[in-house]
Design a protein with these regions (language model features):
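N-terminal acidic leader/helix
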Residues: 1-32
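Short, charged, intrinsically disordered terminal tails
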Residues: 1-10, 58-78
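Short, charge-rich amphipathic interface segments used for partner binding and complex assembly
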Residues: 29-70
Length: 78
């Protein structure tokens, strides 16, 4: 298993990815409400932001996998 410092990094990366995921879900719900209210331009902007969150979430999840597989390690603080 990865060292404790790397395990914490992995947990932190997964937590950040989860926060982005749920923030993206919230943005998509807000975009749907805006669209229903006839504010299509604003809805499209929120959807673009939500899509960018998804891309970053995927990268963070990938980094967490690399930490888990010990391809990325965290050095102990000095």
């Amino acid at each position: 298993p990865p060292p404790k410092t790397s395990q914490q990094l992995c947990r932190d990366l997964k937590e950040a990815a989860a926060l982005l995921k749920w923030s993206g879900v919230d943005l998509m719900q807000a975009a749907a409400r805006l669209s229903e209210a006839g504010q299509e331009d604003e809805a499209k902007e929120l959807l673009k932001i939500a899509a960018s969150y998804q891309a970053v979430e995927d990268r963070l999840a990938g980094y967490a996998d690399e930490v888990r597989d010990q391809r990325i390690t965290r050095a102990k603080p000095e």
